[in-house]
Amino acid sequence: MEYKTTAKLVIQACDKDLPGVFGHGCVLLLQGIAREHSLNRAAKSMGMAYSKAWRIVNEAEGQLGCKLIERDGARGSTLTPAGERAIEVYEELQADINDIIATKADASSLASKSS
């Protein structure tokens, strides 16, 4: 039987009183906002209620202490520079984690074959 090792990065403030976390789902939502220029359309494309998307963004902004999106009423939403940077940092960290897992998995695979 084959197994695959994975890990999902979650960024959370040390202050336990702050709600939510910044993780993969939030990154996907922010990427959707960047693509669709709308929180509502991004949420719909993910099969998510607008209210849930709004809550995810608000909680992530609270966790990170910065605005991730600019809301412009009927004209939609765009990512702030902080929102763009948050995606970039998350993707870099997740790639590093994936590289570490791949390296460790290769090493353990080699060790088990030589036994």
Predicted regions and their residues:
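Helix-turn-helix DNA-binding motif, specifically the short coil turn and the N-cap/start of the second
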Residues: 49
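Alpha-helical linker/hinge and terminal dimerization helices associated
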Residues: 86-108
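Short alpha-helical "packing" element that flanks the helix-turn-helix/winged-helix DNA-binding module
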Residues: 29-30
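Residues within the DNA-recognition helix of helix-turn-helix
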Residues: 56
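Short, Lys/Arg-enriched N-terminal segment that forms or immediately precedes the first helix
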Residues: 2-18
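A short LG(V/I)-centered, amphipathic sequence patch enriched
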Residues: 62-78
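Short helix-boundary/capping micro-motifs
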Residues: 33-41
